[in-house]
Amino acid sequence: KYTVTSYNPLYEALNLISIKSYITTNIDNIVPLVMSNSKRYYLRDISHGPVKKSNTEIQFIPLHGYVTDLNSHLYFGKNELANVDSDNKDLFDAMHDKILNYPTLFIGYGFHDNSVDRVIANTITNPKQDIWVMCLENQTAEINYYRQLGCKIIIGDTNSFLQWVNETFTQKEKHVQTDPLNIVLNEYKIPDACNVELIPKEQYFQKCRTDWYCIFYNYPYVRKHVDDIREKLLSTKNIIVKGIPFSGKTTIAMQVAIRASNNYKLFINELTVERANYIINVLSNKQALIFVDNCCEDAEALSILMKCANLSVIGFTDDFVYESTKHKFDNIKISFINVTELESDEPYRIYEQIPESIRLQFSKVEQDEKCSMVEFINQNVRDSLSEDNVKELFSRIKDVSIKGFEVVALATYLSKNGSALNTDVLCSYFDTTDYSVIKRYISIAQNCLREMSVILEEDLADQDYYLLRSHVFVYLSIKVLMRHYKTEYQKIVKRLILNVSPYKIYRYNVFKRSAYDSSFFNKLFGNDADLLYQHL
């Protein structure tokens, strides 16, 4: 009933102005439909977690629900609307934050919703940014009222406003707007060898850091799967490469990527449905090769790319994740390549790549025996990441600062489940709004991790986010926390669940699938797991 399939073309004018967030009390899909065809923006529903700073991603905050979201409750009646700010507190808090920190335009909003008006009244009386309100010409009382509050006034209706934007900004945007294709290519491009961070070869093997520098300078052995994938690409457009965790899939993805000669090639780590549609819009009908790491974290998004005739797609995933999502690909022709454990002469070939200064005596793999990459590195590389030295590290961090210990434990829990540590999570977790306190805790954690050459670094795209680059460290940390610091880990995970809004957890839609896994929860919390599930 409230879903539309077409719209007034004047709405395309929204693509001409700079937008950071779209907040609405409407439940229809007009603006989302407009943005689904855009080459400048795409909407990202806040229920999926916060949005990193981006010139293309707009945070979408549907205060009363959203008609195309099957999990969204739609608010209609007087009684429901009277309490919607309580039911959707996180959405209203997000609205409050946006109005405080960015100039805001109220367009087509009648100020008849008490729940919304309470938040607006609080921000309008103490504005940090300009607030613009569009009123009809005959709304004299409203115009005078909002002017007295310090708001800027626009006289007109939605139609005339969009027409004005279209007439005013079209020519200007032609001169100043960056080509959307260049934006996409820059965001997802494979970097040049001369523009990547130098990683010593010893660190690659000891700390299991898979970075572009290591690939360009041939640190890892090139396994047969690289040629298998390249050959498969000659006869098929869609490939999924799957295998056990830590079997070298990401390394293989990067090795194939630097060898590909396609004019347009993209390497994507965090694919979403909205991002997939945006990339298709921008590429238009151009032929492109797209690599998607951890591709089954959003299988629907991957299927959208694979169905696009002009795109060749290679996805890389853990086999158990693929098995839980494979129904999403029922009607798509896909070739599969399985990345096996090390076999035959591969262990010795990899051993030859290890710098002599950190080589242990070669631990031979018997003819019929297989081993994982992690096992091989532990057996053949001096001072490599191991459960024992990660345990020692956590012991030292705890002695230095319990807050630093909690930061590292949080970072590993979030990273393990497809998310990332950010300052908003830490502020809620530690119940503080003092960013200097949070920065101090992060600095303590970083300094302790640096002792093992493990990096917790600011995300270059958004400095409110902190990334753990070593997946092996994350994996070993979870094992150590579960085995040796279970009581502390229980408290940390429980506090995260109780204190931190899902809307502050990056990629929450991905995070929640594994972070609250029943097997993990029962091991960690025992009989108390059900109480936490009730809260969730």
Model-inferred region functions:
Residues 1-195, 254, 258, 274:
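SIR2/sirtuin NAD+-dependent deacylase catalytic core
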Residues 68-70, 111-113, 139, 245-248, ...:
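Short acidic, S/G/P-rich loop/turn micro-motifs used as interaction or catalytic elements
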Residues 195-227, 231, 236-238, 245, ...:
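Winged-helix-like regulatory helical subdomains adjacent to P-loop NTPase cores
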Residues 239-265, 277-284, 308, 319-329:
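P-loop NTPase Walker A phosphate-binding motif
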Residues 266-319:
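Conserved P-loop NTPase "ATPase switch" module shared by AAA+ and STAND
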Residues 320-321, 328-367:
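Conserved small helical "lid"/interfacial subdomain of P-loop NTPases
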Residues 357-401, 452-456, 465, 474:
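Loop-to-helix "switch" segment enriched in basic
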Residues 419-536:
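C-terminal leucine-rich, beta-strand-based interaction scaffolds used for sensing/assembly
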